């Protein structure tokens, strides 16, 4: 179960939620019938199917969440700029094209955007374990992801030079709460907004893109096998 799916489904009384720390463990649970289905964001579900034979996505969308950025509590000016940018971005051809790539049955293809390097600095917390939103491309060794595309488009329009601080999602979430950087990207979801507002550890931007939560299940136990690394 992915983080967004966890928020969206934990309150449901008609299902029993079991959490796994790795995709490999989750697939093993499916294989040995410890669970009936796995819930996750559609883009990540596509990637899992590209790594494991014998699984399928159940087409019905079980929930819809929104992608957001987490913003330093001291940077209300930045929050306002991001929300202004997102209002335009949501209606743009760039957003439509990115959404299509994220939800492609072939899997997400990263399109690198060069940072124009403006006269203002923007420090960005970047999880390297949040595929397809932010991660390290193991072929090039560079940062990649859909959130990286979006923050770079924003930075170029508003005159920022990007400075990245990498880490796993947990450390990035802690870091933005402690004011270590201006903004954090990489799979922050609108479903967590209430918790963020109550704890007051950071602010959340408006939603810039919706995403679907879907189930995956075993289609054929006889052909179930890993064909490429999962985690």
Label each residue range with its predicted role:
Residues 1, 7-8, 12-28, 37, ...:
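Extracytoplasmic small-molecule ligand-binding "clamshell" domains
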Residues 10-14, 31-35, 50, 74, ...:
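Sec-exported extracytoplasmic/periplasmic mature domains
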């Amino acid at each position: 179960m992915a983080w967004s799916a966890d928020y969206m489904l934990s309150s449901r009384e008609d299902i029993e939620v079991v959490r796994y720390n790795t995709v490999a463990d989750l697939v093993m649970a499916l294989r040995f019938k410890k669970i009936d289905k796995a819930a996750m964001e559609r883009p990540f579900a596509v990637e899992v199917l590209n790594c494991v034979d014998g699984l399928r996505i159940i087409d019905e969308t079980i929930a819809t969440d929104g992608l957001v950025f987490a913003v330093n509590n001291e940077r209300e000016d930045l929050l306002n700029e991001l929300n202004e940018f997102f209002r335009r971005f949501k209606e743009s051809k760039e957003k439509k094209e990115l959404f299509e790539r994220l939800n492609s049955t072939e899997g997400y293809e990263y399109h690198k955007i060069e940072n124009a390097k403006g006269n203002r600095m923007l420090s960005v917390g970047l999880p390297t374990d949040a595929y397809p939103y932010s991660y390290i491309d193991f072929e090039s060794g560079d940062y990649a992801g859909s959130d990286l595309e979006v923050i770079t488009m924003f930075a170029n329009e508003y005159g920022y030079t990007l400075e990245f601080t990498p880490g796993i999602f947990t450390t990035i979430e802690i870091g933005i709460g402690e004011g270590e950087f201006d903004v954090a990207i990489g799979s922050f979801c609108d479903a967590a907004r209430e918790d963020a507002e109550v704890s007051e550890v950071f602010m959340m931007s408006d939603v810039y893109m919706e995403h679907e939560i879907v189930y995956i299940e075993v289609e054929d136990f006889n052909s179930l096998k890993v064909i490429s690394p999962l985690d």
